[in-house]
C-alpha cells in the first residue's frame, strides 16, 4: 500500500484509488500526480 502524495479521490474502473477518509491507497492502486495507477 502506497501513501498518496495528493488527494486522490478519482475513481478508475469503478474503484476508488483512495476512498474518502482513507489516508492510503487501497485495492492495488497508487496515486501519482493526481492519477490512479495500477500496481
Swiss-Prot record:
Tissue specificity note: Expressed by the venom gland.
Signal peptide (UniProt feature, chain positions): none
Species annotation: Aphonopelma sp.
Keywords: Calcium channel impairing toxin, Disulfide bond, Ion channel impairing toxin, Neurotoxin, Secreted, Toxin, Voltage-gated calcium channel impairing toxin
InterPro entries assigned to the protein according to its UniProt record, in alphabetical order: Hwtx-2-like
Function: Insecticidal toxin that is lethal to cockroaches. Inhibits voltage-gated calcium channels (Cav) in rat cerebellar granule cells.
Pfam families, alphabetized: Toxin_20
Compartments it resides in: Secreted
A GO CC term attached to the entry: extracellular region
The protein, known as: Omega-theraphotoxin-Asp1f
Disulphides: 4-25, 8-31, 17-36
One function term, GO molecular function aspect: toxin activity
Family: Belongs to the neurotoxin 12 (Hwtx-2) family. 06 (TXP1) subfamily.
Main localization of the protein described in the UniProt heading: secreted
